Amino acid sequence: MESVLNNEKAIVVFSGGQDSTTCLFYAKKHFKEVELVTFNYGQRHDTEIEVAKQIAQDQGMKHHVLDMSLLSQLTPNALTQHDMEITNNEDGIPNTFVPARNLLFLSFAGALAYQIGAKHIITGVCETDFSGYPDCRDSFIKSMNVTLSLAMDKDCVIHTPLMWLNKAETWKLSDELEVLDYIRTKTLTCYNGIIGDGCGECPACHLRQRGLNQYLESKGAL
């Protein structure tokens, strides 16, 4: 399987965060040619786009940044509204959820993949540390894979290497890819826009740090 993939082209849905950067290095290992696509949808911090650009430049990779600012016009949410406090809604879904975001992102990634001749799309969604986002579920990804292939009349494969990994296992994968320190210091996960270990207070920082501590404990490095 790996020898086949090594001769093919892939595109990574890339935000500059821990998960998508792990997917970047996963893709570099498994595919002959890799390009990145980042979506500018009016994130809380412009820093996210700049971090993605910097990592792409560091790795010498072709990087597409697409304007998706219309998302912030469709629904108020804590990812795009700077003055909105991050909370859980009554149904348990965080108010950082942007309805249909991954549906749109994968559609545009698929269109770009078609144009550049890439059969494979890699995204860092996962169910294990699932925040309640319905468009991170494996069932949605499988459905989207079929939909994209039918819509473009061309085989398309969506890869989700982190789907069944918790955060500790994601750190383990980055260590196996020999990029744990790079991901720890260069990526942006923090909702408050602080690179690396982040603010230590927001839900994203708590999840990331807890996973790192669990992994380092498991290998006796803490």
Curated annotation (Swiss-Prot):
Reactions that this protein is recorded to catalyse: 7-carboxy-7-deazaguanine + NH4(+) + ATP = 7-cyano-7-deazaguanine + ADP + phosphate + H2O + H(+)
Pathway(s): Purine metabolism; 7-cyano-7-deazaguanine biosynthesis
Keyword Cytoplasm among UniProt keywords: no
Keywords: ATP-binding, Ligase, Metal-binding, Nucleotide-binding, Queuosine biosynthesis, Zinc
Keyword Amino-acid biosynthesis among UniProt keywords: no
Residues binding Zn(2+): 190, 199, 202, 205
EC number of the protein: 6.3.4.20
Quaternary structure and partners: Homodimer.
Protein name: 7-cyano-7-deazaguanine synthase
Upper classification of the organism: Bacteria, Bacillati, Bacillota, Bacilli, Bacillales
Gene: queC
